[in-house]
Amino acid sequence: MTHPLFRHAEFYTTVNRLQDLPQTAGVEVAFAGRSNAGKSSAINTLVGRERFAFVSKTPGRTQHINFFQLGEERFMVDLPGYGYAQVPLAIRQHWGHLLSSYLQTRQSLYGMILIMDIRHPLTKLDLQMLDWFRQTKKPVHVLLTKADKLSKSRALVALNEVRQFLTVNYPHCTVQTFSSLKVAGVEEASQLLQNWFDTGHASVQQENGEISEQKKTPAKGD
């Protein structure tokens, strides 16, 4: 059963340049991952719609930053998949600039869901994404997708190895297994996202309240 968070999910906008990013006052959670790691499938599974985010057998198909609205001032942000060598160098460089700039400077971004294929986790580019995001001190949650491709015992070993690595090197990260095929790990991921959006939304409201109070307070000497 789809989590209530995603009940009214809908496409919002797509951009390919930083200057075109929407001027939202809400909370954003980014979904990032290596091409063909199962990012679009994970989004579709969470939302409960097969073609909500386009799934392609061709890696690197997501070429823009796609915004999906989950309700008032809450957005899932689907970032371009990285690491597909067949994409021309100029486009890969553009994506790199787009991704790093968005992740490091977007004020409304609360956290990142990082998608990794459980059979090939912690690639060089995955670590680069973690390094880009580390300086923001914002939370990261790793979904080890395609867990159905491994036996339960091997999946557990992979999970523990990744968790141990992240605990030592990226303590702001959490991790879980996930399978779109078996619809496994959906409840855990959905609840985490709900908590992130709730916490982020409360922070935004508090900041807006403080700004309003500052405007109401007369300057000394008035």
UniProtKB/Swiss-Prot annotation:
GO terms for molecular function: GTP binding; metal ion binding. SUPFAM superfamilies: P-loop containing nucleoside triphosphate hydrolases. GO terms for biological process: division septum assembly. GTP binds at residues 33-40, 60-64, 78-81, 145-148, 178-180. It comes from the Bacteria. GO terms for cellular component: cytosol. Its cofactor is Mg(2+). Residues 25-199 form the EngB-type G domain. Keywords: Cell cycle, Cell division, GTP-binding, Magnesium, Metal-binding, Nucleotide-binding, Septation. The keyword tRNA-binding does not apply. Mg(2+) binds at S40, T62. Belongs to the TRAFAC class TrmE-Era-EngA-EngB-Septin-like GTPase superfamily. EngB GTPase family. Necessary for normal cell division and for the maintenance of normal septation. PANTHER family: ENGB-TYPE G DOMAIN-CONTAINING PROTEIN, MSS1/TRME-RELATED GTP-BINDING PROTEIN. This is Probable GTP-binding protein EngB. The gene is engB.
